[in-house]
């Protein structure tokens, strides 16, 4: 079978205007809870797309670590490629793909750093190995495996079981300016609902052609 012959018919659900939540945050919460209930693998995994100062895009999978009406938070090394991209161009796009439910959620928005207190709280909730790793990894820089493991041992010896949060590590929050909810439907006539700010503190919903 060739790649062009790979097809799947989407028939599991619908997404209609009269049943969609008025708030995209509420709609996201409903779908996220359903992904959890369906035991979708890593439902908090999302594609994060950024663009550097020269307009070169890059994308990677990261894990969302919190969301509320302020936006969607994730944590990383500020000196990584994504960190440099966001310093030059503080805008990003997110994409959640919950394949077992035949659903996608796309989010666009501006990006801000979370507070130091939020970064500290999340950092100290992580397993020890992950906290050590945040120090050991000079993210996105070339390294050999031996160098990386030596650095890990050095950090363990220095900090023991209480490493502080590195100054180059912390959180970002994507503050949405657009949501799109996608539900697969038969014959590629998918449901796509877009939410945009209505200028009055709420959100306007429209249907997009599939």
Curated annotation (Swiss-Prot):
One of its GO terms (molecular function) is pyridoxamine phosphate oxidase activity. The keyword Flavoprotein applies. Keywords: Flavoprotein, FMN, Oxidoreductase, Pyridoxine biosynthesis. GO terms for biological process: pyridoxine biosynthetic process. Pfam families: PNP_phzG_C, PNPOx_N. It is an enzyme of class 1 (oxidoreductase). The keyword Mitochondrion does not apply. Its EC number is 1.4.3.5. FMN binds at residues 60-65, 75-76, 81-82, 104, 139-140, 182, 192. It catalyses: pyridoxamine 5'-phosphate + O2 + H2O = pyridoxal 5'-phosphate + H2O2 + NH4(+); pyridoxine 5'-phosphate + O2 = pyridoxal 5'-phosphate + H2O2. This is Pyridoxine/pyridoxamine 5'-phosphate oxidase. It comes from Bordetella petrii (strain ATCC BAA-461 / DSM 12804 / CCUG 43448).
